[in-house]
């Protein structure tokens, strides 16, 4: 991966995403290892992690449900969608279901303003959602995750 980027610092975000996909979250050990390999301080790595909402230092569920509540989504029902997901999954912001299948996050923007309200589950976008539509989305992931 290093050969595709001009500097070691520029490979940090893709490397963090790869490590997180492999391990499930960015543990202290992963952060230390990446900092050493990329010749960065652990503080440099942690600063980048804290900036991006898709990166986490805590274990998440198999499916990370990110509900956008920025202005476009908010005006079209994003907050109500978040509340609906909280009730449906039985968890709140930054929570994980007891079976480890779902995590839920409120996020500021996922770049899908034209299709608001929108939710991102892992790397998949779901747009123009209603409570009924998000129920179907969550049920589909639930079935897939239990197979």
At which residue positions do the language-model features occur?
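Signature of N-terminal electron-transfer/Fe-S-associated modules in redox systems
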Residues: 1-147
């Amino acid at each position: 991966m290093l050969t595709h980027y001009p500097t070691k610092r520029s490979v940090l975000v893709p490397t963090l995403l790869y490590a997180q996909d492999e391990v499930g979250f960015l543990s202290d050990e992963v952060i230390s290892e990446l900092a050493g390999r990329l010749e960065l301080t652990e503080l440099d790595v942690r600063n980048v992690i804290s900036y991006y909402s898709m990166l986490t230092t805590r274990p998440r569920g198999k499916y990370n449900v990110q509900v956008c509540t920025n202005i476009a989504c908010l005006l079209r029902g994003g907050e109500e969608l978040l509340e609906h997901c909280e009730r449906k999954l039985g968890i709140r912001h930054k929570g994980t279901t007891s079976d480890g299948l779902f995590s839920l996050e409120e996020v500021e923007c996922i770049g899908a303003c034209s299709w608001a309200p929108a939710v991102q589950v892992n790397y998949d976008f779901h747009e123009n959602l209603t409570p009924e539509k998000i129920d179907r989305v969550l049920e589909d992931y639930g079935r897939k995750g239990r197979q």
